[in-house]
């Protein structure tokens, strides 16, 4: 077997060329999702599947969010109906424990969800932190995000970010609702109040989280555990049905809103 020889400078140039082509492309998006956990990946999967240009920024060098930790590091988590339909769609094996309740392998879950998201057309970028948003007035709207290398922030270096535009920004950062928290603090006219999440009550938390997922302010959406933080909903522990269904609902809301905005714009242009 003869292995193709590639020198170091070619390696560098090929990587830089492909990388900058990507960054030039996804500097403008339909949807930017912050956080590659279960809700973020689900939102990205369904957004990309619908043909929306979708980019996911994940501050870590991995994806899956809380999936990988399983339940207190045990490698299994619970999924309930109807979220099992999403896992069947992407080929995750389900172990049935009772009607509508299943246990899945955490590694398989996050690997297949990420692969399905990429195959649907979404771009996932690791090692990038979103630390602010872009906004516009008249009408007031969130129109993108400010991004920085996670390593730069960890090193406490004073470096300005770059900016990425999006018609919809999704906060899927988990319990801290980091993007919405920044927007709430720095753009008070958005009128966002963050009461904080409540202690565990899984029987009601799953339903409430899905129902309350969606647009928080024009152009800004909440998915997954970020919803519990901004809506004072209880936490639910290692049951992940709501995370998937929340991401799917947010994607559906974005698709509907962007279609409505597009129709309005076309109507105005005709007039």
Swiss-Prot record:
InterPro entries: FAD/NAD-bd_sf (IPR036188), Thi4_fam (IPR002922), Thi4_prok (IPR022828). NCBIfam families: sulfide-dependent adenosine diphosphate thiazole synthase. One of its GO terms (molecular function) is pentosyltransferase activity. Glycine binds at residue 235. Involved in the biosynthesis of the thiazole moiety of thiamine. Catalyzes the conversion of NAD and glycine to adenosine diphosphate 5-(2-hydroxyethyl)-4-methylthiazole-2-carboxylate (ADT), an adenylated thiazole intermediate, using free sulfide as a source of sulfur. NAD(+) binds at residues 39, 58-59, 66, 130, 158-160, 225. Its EC number is 2.4.2.59. Fe cation binds at residues 160, 175. GO terms for biological process: thiamine biosynthetic process; thiamine diphosphate biosynthetic process; thiazole biosynthetic process. Pathway: Cofactor biosynthesis; thiamine diphosphate biosynthesis. Disulfide bonds: none annotated. The gene is thi4. This is Thiamine thiazole synthase. The keyword Nucleotide-binding does not apply. Gene3D superfamilies: FAD/NAD(P)-binding domain. Keywords: Iron, Metal-binding, NAD, Thiamine biosynthesis, Transferase. Homooctamer; tetramer of dimers. Its cofactor is Fe(2+).
């Amino acid at each position: 077997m003869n292995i193709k020889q590639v020198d170091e400078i070619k390696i560098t140039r090929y990587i830089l060329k492909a990388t900058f082509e990507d960054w030039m492309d996804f500097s403008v998006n339909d949807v930017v999702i912050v956080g590659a956990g279960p809700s973020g990946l689900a939102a990205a999967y369904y957004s990309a599947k619908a043909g929306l240009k979708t980019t996911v920024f994940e501050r870590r060098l991995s994806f899956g969010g809380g999936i990988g930790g399983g339940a207190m590091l045990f490698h299994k988590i619970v999924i309930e109906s109807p979220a099992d339909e999403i896992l069947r769609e992407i080929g995750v094996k389900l172990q049935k424990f009772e009607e509508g309740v299943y246990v899945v392998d955490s590694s398989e879950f996050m690997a297949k969800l990420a692969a399905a998201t990429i195959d649907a057309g979404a771009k996932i970028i690791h090692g990038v932190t979103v630390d602010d948003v872009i906004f516009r007035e008249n009408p007031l709207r969130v129109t993108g995000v400010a991004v920085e290398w996670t390593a730069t922030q960890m090193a406490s270096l004073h470096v300005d970010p770059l900016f990425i535009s999006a018609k919809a920004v999704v906060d899927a950062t988990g319990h801290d609702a980091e993007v919405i928290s920044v927007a709430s603090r720095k753009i008070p006219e958005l009128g966002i109040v963050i009461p904080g999440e409540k202690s565990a009550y899984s029987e009601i938390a799953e339903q409430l989280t899905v129902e309350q997922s969606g647009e928080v302010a024009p152009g800004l959406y909440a998915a997954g555990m970020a919803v519990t933080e901004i809506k004072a909903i209880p936490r639910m522990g290692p049951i992940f049905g709501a995370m998937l269904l929340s991401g799917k609902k947010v994607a559906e809301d974005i698709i509907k809103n962007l279609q409505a905005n597009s129709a309005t714009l076309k109507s105005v242009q005709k007039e």
